Amino acid sequence: MPQGEGALRAWIDVAAGEVKSVQADLALRQVQLRFPGRTAQALPLERLQGRVSAARDGRTLRFAAERLAVASGSINWPASRWNLARHDDDRAAAAAAAASGASAATLSFDGGEFTADRLDIGALATLAAQLPLGEAVKQLLIELAPSGQVNNLAARWDGPLDSPRSYTLKAQASALAIAAKPAADANRLGRPGWRNATLDIEASENGGRAQLALNKGAPVFPGLFERPEVAFDSFGTKLSWRIAPQTTGALPVIEVTATDTQFANADAHGQLAKA
């Protein structure tokens, strides 16, 4: 943090000459925040307030925030609580140290967990360019252009965040909007999107389930209809999907089922038991 003004109170736990944990209460203004090991421009924040902590336990590095609020330009992130645990990849760290003489602090990561009671994903997407996220995650956020609020998020992954070997995700979202993406082949369906949605989701590398509802919103289906966006006064459906991995280099096969679908708009209303 090369720049900032305000108040900071910190507690540091040291054992056998090593820092084991750090906890700080922050009430800062006009902050320039830079993440370790990153060469990108510092992240400017008008306000940063709350309690943050970091601790190491064996291979696991834990970060936590309580009542953390952030303001930057048009972004006003309300006070929230989150926890992040990232597991060191000992093999990668040893190889890097042997190859370059880097210290033990130069670590790659091999999995972790993340929980949060509330996240403004539009603000997160805007800040993503300066956050320590993988490039694939950043690119996906740019493509999705998400907005809305996510509550009770719990995620776990094994392997690199860009390409995890396995993962689980559970969350609820409201006022959610995600951009659709047409397929490169005009004869194929693109990636669907929606606006003003409520979503309850559980997912893993093998598949998942979700309950989707729209109130004065619209799903977007590129390649399915002449006009891809279909506005609804109300819409609800239960989704389930299975993911079947293919041979190396081939995209996985995804089978999606929709049940208990109900819809109503100015032109029609009805329900479908299964699709």
PLM features: residue spans?
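Active-site pocket-lining segments that scaffold enzyme catalytic pockets across diverse folds
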Residues: 194-196
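Hydrophobic/aromatic interaction determinants used to assemble and anchor large protein complexes
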Residues: 66-75, 80-82
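Extended amphipathic, helix-rich lipid-handling scaffolds
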Residues: 1-21, 25-71, 94-186, 199-201, ...
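Polar/acidic, low-complexity leader/linker segments enriched in S/T/G and N/D
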Residues: 81-82, 86-88, 101
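Short consensus segments that form the blades of beta-propeller domains
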Residues: 189-191
